[in-house]
Amino acid sequence: EYRKSMQGKIMKGVGGFYYIHPHNTVNTIYECKAKGAFRNQKIKPAVGDDVEIEIISEQDKTGNIVEILPRENLLIRPAVANVDQAVIVFALADPKPNYNLLDRFLIMMGQQGVETLICFNKSDLVSGQEAKEICDIYAGAGYQVFLTVAKENVGVDAFREAIRGKTSVFAGPSGVGKSSMLNALH
């Protein structure tokens, strides 16, 4: 039997289900499973993948992923594909920044050819001089660096402009303010 197919982007993946937003639609999401062929090939769909789906039920908005279209890039941690840029969020204090980890993130993104922005959050917890010195190091290495206090909306507007219209993945250690930053952007 012939099933209607369409292309879309994976917006979320939870427990073997993938939520696909079809191209050229507004506010439509299909819940899909990946065909067994992907498991046999040890390929796993990732958030951000452009995929071909076949519709099982138009009414229930369910389908199967039948093809993963060519990827521009693929990040392993977090597992996400076809991003325009990565945003690495670190706190300048509380928790104290692990610059070794930050540098590893930057190297990993660079190896994938992903443009990377650095957002130093909680910049109110250190002196202006210390914040400037840290920013100068990474800006001097060619990165766009932002100082923010997400909970007080400080520095958020400039940061919002830098990510506007781009598919961005946020990464960083626990407790640095990634969720606060995403909330401040809304």
Predicted regions and their residues:
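N-terminal accessory targeting/assembly segments
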Residues: E1-Y99
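Signal for well-folded cores of large energy- and translation-related assemblies
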Residues: M11, G15, P70, L106-G110, ...
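Residue-level signal for inorganic ion chemistry
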Residues: G48, M109, N121
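Conserved beta-strand/loop subsegment of P-loop NTPase cores
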Residues: V83-F90, Q112-N121, Y143-L147
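Histidine-anchored nucleotide/phosphate-binding helix
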Residues: N100-G110, E115
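A conserved segment at the C-terminal end of the G1
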Residues: S179-H186
